[in-house]
Amino acid sequence: VIVSNLPRAVGVTRRAVRKLDPVPEVLELDVTDADQLAALPQQLRDLGVEKLDGVVHAIAFANPKTALGGKFLETEWDDVSVAVHTSTYSYVSLMTALVDILAEHASVVGLTFDATVSWPFYDWMGVAKAGLESANRYLARYLGPKGVRCNLVSAGPLDTMAKTAIPGADAFNDVWGERAPLGWDTKDTTPAAKGIVALLSDWFPAT
């Protein structure tokens, strides 16, 4: 297992992964930087990784002051482009950078949040997630012939650091809890994590 994060946030990641045994390597990576993406395969080879069995894309960002929280009609293109580049296009650009070192029957898993409806406060992140879901279908079309599986996990709201940056995000909690037939606990990341692990495994060879 190898983990990455933005250079400015990599310290937080290093502290978090210390809970794991063995502790994984942590790379500094800005997926919006073409040069860093181009250098990534060699960085992985230098760590002894010849082939990747799976990739988890858990990357998203929209400026909470300008692109979230009910300011949808006022958001300028510069902020929209950051949200789409980081949250949508990076899924494709990351896999384009890694395609030559993907193992046979590798699995790619990304994270989304139901983009079939408009959510209060979610605004341009909702648009970016809709783009991500469409991008995943195209990624599956183009990587499928290489034996690579591409899927997204659409979990309910979880009490993560990312969620705290969304103004009004707690409003999701009650709505999701009321609608989910099996119920939903925003503090329990296990269901989402198990879904990701299952898709990374070989238990879904044609999914």
Model-derived features with residue positions:
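C-terminal substrate-recognition "lid" of short-chain dehydrogenase/reductases
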Residues: 185-207
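Catalytic loop of short-chain dehydrogenase/reductase
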Residues: 60-100, 104-145, 157-160
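Hydrophobic structural elements of the Rossmann-like NAD(P)H-binding subdomain
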Residues: 56, 109, 150-153, 163
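Residue-level signal for the nucleotide or nucleotide-sugar donor/cofactor binding architecture
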Residues: 32, 89, 186-190
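Short, small/polar-rich loop/turn modules that mediate ligand/substrate recognition or access, typified
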Residues: 144, 149, 206-207
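A glycine/serine/threonine-rich, flexible loop-to-helix segment
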Residues: 15, 124, 145, 155-181
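Short-chain dehydrogenase/reductase
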Residues: 1-78, 91, 95, 136-137, 164-165, 171-172, ...
